[in-house]
Each structure stands twice: as structure tokens, then as C-alpha cells.
Design a protein with these regions (language model features):
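Short, charged, low-complexity patches
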Residues: 85, 199-208
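Beta-lactam-recognizing serine transpeptidase/beta-lactamase-like catalytic domain environment
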Residues: 1-194, 237-240
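Short, low-complexity, polar/charged sequence segments that are solvent-exposed and flexible
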Residues: 24-25, 92, 197-198, 208-213
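Short, gly/Ser/Thr-rich active-site loops of penicillin-recognizing serine hydrolases
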Residues: 114-122, 208-240
């Protein structure tokens, strides 16, 4: 099922999803364009078709436009900035609210008087999934973290997904981790990328540090010690 496929990073499951999208669940002949059209439709609903709104330069996202079987696991020519993945996982964490992003909380004058405040703005809401379907995704992302030794004995329940972004056969993959916590009632979502970082567990270790600081598990002095932690291992480490 989808929860187990997420938890085990099972490419075969999602290859099959991509193929089903291109064959209307096996009812028609394979149609690459039809499969890609469906992937683009859902990716757009989750905010992956445009920049997030932050007030700094941001690359335009690229939703895959070929090879739906590969695109279904994030390959093909999918291409996203880390913050775009951050908004994507935030939408998953809150069951479909896609927010306009901003770096600003408020603007003050030189005397500290508030001139303008910035409230959260919802770009759109994904209403094509029901609670059972959202919960299946949440369960799978929780299973991912339960398979990561990085989070052994971590006091906050985290849900997330590891990944490796491939750029060149001559350099290591980019290390990726997206997630949110607490699992049952999310307060924070996060996307981490280490350029050419080899394994997603390096990114997961960094994300754990952010969660640790946010939830007062460790303070800055403990975390910023100049030493890299052992990244640990996972039963799905070869499948990211």
C-alpha cells in the first residue's frame, strides 16, 4: 500500500503509479502525454508550478514534462528549489493548504513601532484528497523516520521523506530530507538539502538539529560544536 511504499522508499510502487496514470489505470494504451498531464495537474495543486513568494531570488520550478514512470519517483526532468519542496511538504503536513511564503513577520520604524504585519496567506487548498488518503501519506512519512537510526530516541515524533537529487554522473547526489513535527499535530515543516551531500541521511541529521533547536531538545551551544555526527543508517538507504 502507499504507506508502506513511502516508508520503504519503494520505487517499484511509484513506477507502477506513473504507468497507471499513463494508461488510465490499464484501461487504455500507454500514453506518455496523458500520464505527464496528470502528474502536472497534481503537482500544480501542491504549489510546485510556481515560485513560493519569498522576497529573495528563487529559481523557477520545473514539473516534469516527459517520462511519467520516471517522473513519478521524482526523476525525469523535475527540478525544484529547496524552498519549493518546503512549501510542498508544508501542504502535506496541514492536509492541503498551500501557503504563499514570505520571510517577513512585520515592518517597524526606527522607534520600533509596527508599520505593517504579514499574516499567513493561503494560495490554494488541495481538496481532491479525503482524510483517509491524507492519513495514508502521513503514516508513510512517519514510517520513513521510524526506519532512520538518526531519530532513534528522539523525543518528538517526526514525519518525513528522504531523497537524493541526481544532477551529474561525475559528482555525488544532492542529499535531501523533508519533514514536519510533531507528527500528530504539526507546528513546523522543513526541507533540507546538502549540495553533493552523498546520502539523504546527512540531510536528515541536519533536519534533526533544526527540530532539536525548535523544540528545545538541545540548545545552540550543544548543536554548533564543530563536529559532524554519525549519520546512522536506514533499512531503505539504498532506495532513496
Amino acid at each position: 500500500n502507499v504507506s508502506e511504499a513511502l516508508g520503504d522508499s519503494c520505487n517499484y510502487f511509484f513506477y507502477d503509479v506513473g504507468y497507471r496514470l499513463a494508461t488510465n489505470n490499464f484501461s487504455t494504451s500507454y500514453d506518455d502525454a496523458a500520464g505527464i498531464s496528470k502528474i502536472q495537474e497534481y503537482a500544480s495543486l501542491l504549489g510546485l508550478d510556481e515560485t513560493t513568494g519569498v522576497e529573495i531570488e528563487e529559481n523557477d520550478p520545473q514539473i516534469a514534462d516527459e517520462y511519467p514512470v520516471m517522473a513519478a519517483i521524482g526523476q525525469s526532468n523535475n527540478n525544484y528549489a529547496t524552498i519549493q519542496l518546503g512549501r510542498y511538504v508544508s501542504a502535506i503536513a496541514n492536509d492541503g493548504n498551500v501557503y504563499e511564503y514570505t520571510l517577513l513577520n512585520k515592518v517597524c520604524d526606527s522607534d520600533g513601532n509596527t508599520l505593517e504585519t504579514f499574516e499567513p496567506k493561503v494560495r490554494n487548498t488541495v481538496d481532491v484528497l479525503d482524510t483517509t488518503q491524507w492519513n495514508a501519506i502521513h503514516t508513510g512519512m512517519r514510517m520513513v523516520v521510524e526506519n532512520l537510526s538518526t531519530f532513534d530516541d528522539f523525543p518528538i515524533e517526526v514525519a518525513g521523506k528522504t531523497g537524493t537529487a541526481q544532477q551529474s554522473p561525475n559528482r555525488p547526489n544532492h542529499a535531501l530530507f523533508v519533514g514536519y513535527a510533531p507528527y500528530s499535530d504539526p507546528e513546523i515543516s522543513i526541507a533540507t538539502r546538502i549540495a553533493f551531500g552523498y546520502t539523504s541521511h546527512n540531510a536528515a541529521e541536519y533536519a534533526k538539529n533544526v527540530f532539536s533547536y525548535y523544540f528545545d531538545v538541545q540548545d545552540a551551544e550543544e548543536l554548533l560544536n564543530g563536529q559532524a555526527e554519525n549519520v546512522g543508517e536506514s533499512s531503505n538507504s539504498f532506495n532513496d
